[in-house]
Structure formats: structure tokens, C-alpha cells
């Protein structure tokens, strides 16, 4: 498929041929869902922790004798039914990550790129080189281009001036091609890829 290439000043820079096997697939929500779920589970801290019966600070002494009191049978005050007692089967620190095949993850990235291309939310830009790291200059360019919530993917290395200028702009994320992932692509309304980024992604996903 063919895509128009623009410059940062919104002028035309010709066109580029995009690989249909990467940018021209029919997006499948089930594949995207599985990959996003894998990403978010992997990112989850899993530091949740509560005190169990063996962790709370109480004596293990039996609170009163077994028989003859007319009350229910009890052991120590660490039991979950008592105030300040331990929590029964509460959450403990653990990893929430689960396995997902490497080929399936690559397929998910292809479907994420295709979803932006098929909905007209993919923009190919010649490069994002800036002579100086000025947020005001980039903000003006972004306004003229009509970008609201965008993810910009560059080649192997991000242009340092652009990255610094974009740091203070709300709604703009910048990633190198190796950092391109399904969750960040779907999170933003528009995907902007440099020509170097397109080449790097096509080489990565061949």
C-alpha cells in the first residue's frame, strides 16, 4: 500500500510504499486484546500484601478454655474473625506476568500498525529533525499539523532535540522503533512514523 509522506512543516515529501503484510492486515480485536493484556499484566507491580494469621502480632495462647464457658470454641486472637486478626487467603507479593509466544507478539504489533493504517490514523513523516530543542517551535508545528494525541516512532535513535521539545507537550509520546508496542500504539489516536522508523519496523517484523 502507498502512503503520503509529509515534513514537519506540513509540506509534502512524496510517497512511500508500505508492506501490506505489516500495514495492510485486517485488524483482529482478539489478537490485540491478548497482547495488550500480556503487556499490562507484565507491567503490574504485584506488590500487594496483607498480614496473614501467622504474620499478625498477637499471642498464640488459647483465649479461654475449650468447654464450659458457653461461648464458641476459639484458639488464638490471630484468627480472621477477630478485630486485628490475620486476613484469610489475602493477596501476597507475586508476579502477574504470563507467557505469550514471541511470534504472536509480533503478529499483535502488525495488527496494531494495520489498525492505524486502515482507519486513516497513520502518518508517515520524512524525519523529525529539529535544529534546536524548543518546545514553542514544536507546539506551533503540532498545532498546524492538527495532532492531538499522537505517538511518534522514529528509527533506531530518536532525534534528541525533538525528544526534548516534546517532553513538555501534553499528548505526545516519542519512542524508538525498538520500543514500538501494541499498548502505546492503541493508546494514542494518531500514529506518526518517520521513514527511518518504517524501514526499521519492516526489518524487525519481516
Curated annotation (Swiss-Prot):
Keywords, in A-Z order: Ribonucleoprotein, Ribosomal protein, RNA-binding, rRNA-binding
Pfam family name, one: Ribosomal_L4
Gene Ontology BP term (one): translation
Family: Belongs to the universal ribosomal protein uL4 family.
Functional note: One of the primary rRNA binding proteins, this protein initially binds near the 5'-end of the 23S rRNA. It is important during the early stages of 50S assembly. It makes multiple contacts with different domains of the 23S rRNA in the assembled 50S subunit and ribosome. Forms part of the polypeptide exit tunnel.
Oligomer and partners: Part of the 50S ribosomal subunit.
Protein's recorded name: Large ribosomal subunit protein uL4
Gene: rplD
